[in-house]
Amino acid sequence: MFSAQNKIHKDKGVAPTEFEERVAQAFFDLENTNQELKSDLKDLYINQAVSMDIAGNRKAVVIYVPFRLRKAFRKIHSRLVRELEKKFSGNDVIFVATRRIMRPPKKGSAVQRPRNRTLTSVHEAMLEDVAYPAEIVGKRTRYRVDGTKIMKVYLEPKERNNTEYKLETMVGVYRKLTGKDVVFEYPVADP
């Protein structure tokens, strides 16, 4: 019969961790108990789940979903996040699509690498995933006097009430995933 094991597909030969099994079980329970999510969750599964400690005594649950299923997850994102945050006692839940980064081709090699496999492209796509459901409406890179870079990301003001409470978590998760500093802001509307 169906079980929580069907909700997590890892690479060959890798067993899921205890935390990943808890997340898969939460997905399975939601599919069986929540009628409005049942049909949407039927064919969905995850690749990996990680619990991250964020500064300020907060925790985040980062769930990696297959790249091909990210659109299906985005359709039910707000309802799914709300239910999973209840199950994980207030931890912020963030969905990120699994993407691969390829090395640059060697000199003299005729091999081309796709744009979506470059480090820059993968990091930009991760930024969009972390900021979802808010859309990114602008970016500024600020270079400090000491040479460090910080990226300011402006989010869609319409989604402010859905994302404002987890801005710190989004900053911490993006820093842990990519090693880059980022600040999320909402653009000030001109009166």
From Swiss-Prot:
Keywords: Acetylation, Ribonucleoprotein, Ribosomal protein
Any one GO CC term of the record: small-subunit processome
Tagged with keyword Transmembrane helix: no
Residues annotated with N-acetylmethionine modification: M1
InterPro entries (UniProt xref): Ribosomal_eS7 (IPR000554), Ribosomal_eS7_CS (IPR047861)
A Gene Ontology biological process term: rRNA processing
Gene Ontology MF term list: mRNA binding; structural constituent of ribosome
Any single Pfam family the record assigns to this protein: Ribosomal_S7e
Family under the similarity heading: Belongs to the eukaryotic ribosomal protein eS7 family.
UniProt-recorded name of the protein: Small ribosomal subunit protein eS7
Gene: RPS7
